[in-house]
């Protein structure tokens, strides 16, 4: 009896597939329209190189450019910063060859490409997650960066500036799960800073 039932179900399924074929057109198109750029790499670009890169991005259909981290804390505690910052945290920092934030915004202004500025990052993110003082410090420094970058560049390049990128991406590793309350606290510090700029 079970075999007869299975056979009937198979026949009904086949008839349904024949009578009600699946739609041939896609309901949505996948679209690749954004890209990342590293500050350390692009800090040596002049405006001509930026324009070449932006032309290539536009040709590829890019609408969004994400600058990865614009301030990086090495495991020895030193910072490298890729924009002209006056923050006390960066008093002894090494500065990149050029102000990547301004160069990206200036060259993308009027191009139709929107720029998201990556905040800070530190080397131990992948091994410490949200534990320890480094993550807390990073979130506080990133909040200060938001205020500084917003006040310094957004009114100059309103068509290019689009938002922020939280550089230490989350993963599903065990440390992230264990440190999620600390991660949430740090992200909230950054969200509060963003809300103050609106």
For each feature predicted by the language model, list its residue ranges.
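N-terminal secretory signal peptides that target proteins for export/translocation
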Residues: 1-4
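Glycan-processing catalytic domains of CAZymes
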Residues: 27-198
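Bacterial Sec-dependent signal peptides at the C-terminal "C-region" and cleavage site
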Residues: 8-29
């Amino acid at each position: 009896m079970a075999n007869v039932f299975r056979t009937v179900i198979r026949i009904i399924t086949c008839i349904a597939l024949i009578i009600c074929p699946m739609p041939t057109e896609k309901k949505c198109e996948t679209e690749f329209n954004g890209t990342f750029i590293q500050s350390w790499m692009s800090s040596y670009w002049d405006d001509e190189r930026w324009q070449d890169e932006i032309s290539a991005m536009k040709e590829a259909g890019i609408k969004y450019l994400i600058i990865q981290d614009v301030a990086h804390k090495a495991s020895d505690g030193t910072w490298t910063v890729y924009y002209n910052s006056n923050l006390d945290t960066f008093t002894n920092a090494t500065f990149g060859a050029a102000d990547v934030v301004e160069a990206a915004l200036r060259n993308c202004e009027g191009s139709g490409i929107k720029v998201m500025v990556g905040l800070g990052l530190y080397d131990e993110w992948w091994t410490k997650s949200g534990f320890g003082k480094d993550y807390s410090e990073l979130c506080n420094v990133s909040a200060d960066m938001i205020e500084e970058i917003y006040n310094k560049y957004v009114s100059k390049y309103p068509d290019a500036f689009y938002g922020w990128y939280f550089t230490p991406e989350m993963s599903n590793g065990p440390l992230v799960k264990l440190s999620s309350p600390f991660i949430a606290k740090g992200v909230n510090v950054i969200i509060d800073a963003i809300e103050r700029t609106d």
